[in-house]
Amino acid sequence: MGGLIAAGYLDRFGSLGRVAKVASLATPFNGSFEAVLKIAVGTGDLGGEAPSSREREAARMLPALYHLIPAIPGAVQAGPGLSSDLFQASAWQRRVVETIAEFVRFHGLRPVAPMEQAERLFSAMLCEARAFRGRVDELQLERAGLKPSDWLCVAGVNSPTRVRLPIRGQNGEVEFLLRSGDRENRWDSNRCPAGRDREQGLTGDGTVPFEGAVPKFLGRENVVCVTPQDFGYWEIADRVLDRAAGFHGILPNMNMIHRLIVRHFTGSPDLHGATWGRAAPGVPPGHWNPAVRLLRNKDVKG
């Protein structure tokens, strides 16, 4: 979420923010479906596996989690008469508001009409989240004195990740269909960018879908994609954690990314070919333009 905070800061303060360069790792600029799972059922790749009523209550009362709601074109597939806009309260299951109402009833300073208070509070959290995300989407780097080459944007790929959310109506209630088949990984490491079409964007780091990690203030050609296979030979513990806990949480530990960040902030050359990355799906050959100059394209053999 740090990348979202940095983008919000730059939008608010512009060139007064005194920022020269930024690096963001697996930031859900367009959201993550794991935030929906955490709010809806109390589980997901943003935390532990076993859902609990206490965890659901905490998630539903946490404003920051609503800032991670996904807004990816075509990814929320709503049934007839239902909204696909998850920043609208009507798109959500009623029990979310009911949980907030119970919290107000037990812990509110004025526990009068808790359901009405809960509806206002839920709508307010969604509206604030939508407004913030809108400001991030409309960020203009030049207003902050920056160029695309000043922002290193790293996205994790080649891990099964939830890339869509079907919504259906059931007995007058909204129902989120949380299906394992909606976790996909169509990334193909054997195909170079010339053959890697946008469909291979149906991947991610296990938590953030690739399409959720591409900010609107940068182009796809500016994104650096990394995979779990980029862990070094001796990063044995990190490889184990990747399999056990997912790529998203362990991605910042990758030695190669540390070297990449140092190169970005210092402008130092790569004398030994120790930093690399991959172009994003849909980027034509020769158009990859990452922030770090002369970054080795891992897709190009030899």
What role is predicted for each listed range?
Residues 5-9:
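Hydrolases whose catalytic domains are alpha/beta-hydrolase-1, hotdog thioesterase
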Residues 11-302:
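Helical cap/lid subdomain of alpha/beta-hydrolase-fold lipid enzymes
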Residues 1-2:
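Gly/Ala-rich beta-loop-alpha elbow adjacent to hydrolase catalytic centers
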